[in-house]
Amino acid sequence: MTMNKANTMCLGGAQNPSVSVTEDQEGTYTVDLYLSYSDGEPVQGATYTLTDQSGAVFEGTLDNNGKASVGGVAPGEFAIEYGEDSRDFMPNVPTKTNPNFNPSANAQLIIEETKKGEVGFWENAWTRMSGAASWIWGVILGDFNDDASVEQIIANTALTMIPVVDQAADVRDLSANIMTLLSEEERDKPENWLALSLTLVGCVPTFGSAVKGTCKVALKGGKGTSKDTLLAVLRGMGKGDPEKFLRTLDWMDYAKQTSQIVSDVLKPCIEVATELASYANRMGADELGAYFLKLADEVKIIDKMVPDKLKEAMGEFDKLFARILGKGEKLIQQK
């Protein structure tokens, strides 16, 4: 940047550096710095390093208004490097509270809500069900679509039992993850547990959306993902120091939280399947009753495996992030 220009630039996906230059009487210049997020909120306490044409280096810290003045800068070009906001990272939009959350719901209530077709994004599955007023009567009469009906149970249970969700698609994705893991063969594939862990991260209160966003970027780019890319994504999702946030993530705590979240869905699913088996048997539909008991057994297996498998999956995220965060240049440069 030359002394006769004042430039405003957008860098790093979220931050907005601005510089103005004033000539001093003694032939040097004063450079006024300002750094803000794209919404205009100042970046607080970020460090800066200004190097002028003569090689002189000026270091300091922006104030809480994102500003600083640097005097005595030699004529000619200069370069500025900024650090991160000194505050702890906080997402712009914390993970959303689930308005349907009802931890006291029992199996009967979940069945009744499922019969109503409360989960809107399963409407396509409902259209595949013929004639009967509710799918449960279709079950008893033998008009039963295994996949669509079981997914409906899981989706409605998740919608009832998860306190927060990143987005509505999380419930759909969680149902699909669990459906996949009902197969013994699929339970042996690490990628299926990794997919489950990614969905569940989005359901962790406050930081779930931000962590899930960076996990998706890291998984897509793998070892080739740069630190700069990862932090730019996170910087676009909140304010504060993204690198400190990622370096201090407690992945084993995330494993514990996500294990509890999915268990809170699986256990009611077991109760629902057991209740439906009892109901089918009372109606003389013994084969269907056996199907639901088998379903309950498979879900129990998943629930038992969850803690160890999610620890392994979160451990993989920990290793991947450690490799990525070991790379990269300083994030914000202005010349």
Q: Where is each model-derived feature located?
A:
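Surface-exposed coil/turn segments at beta-strand junctions on protein surfaces, enriched
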Residues: 24-26, 63, 73
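Short, ordered, surface-exposed loop/turn motifs in non-cytosolic proteins
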Residues: 39-53
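A general sequence property marking short-to-moderate contiguous segments
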Residues: 1-22
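Hydrophobic, membrane-inserting alpha-helical segments
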Residues: 187-246, 256-260, 290, 311
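Short Pro-Gly-centered beta-turn/loop motif in secreted/extracellular proteins
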Residues: 43, 68-80
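Short, acidic Ser/Thr/Gly-rich low-complexity loop/linker segments typical of extracellular
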Residues: 55-67
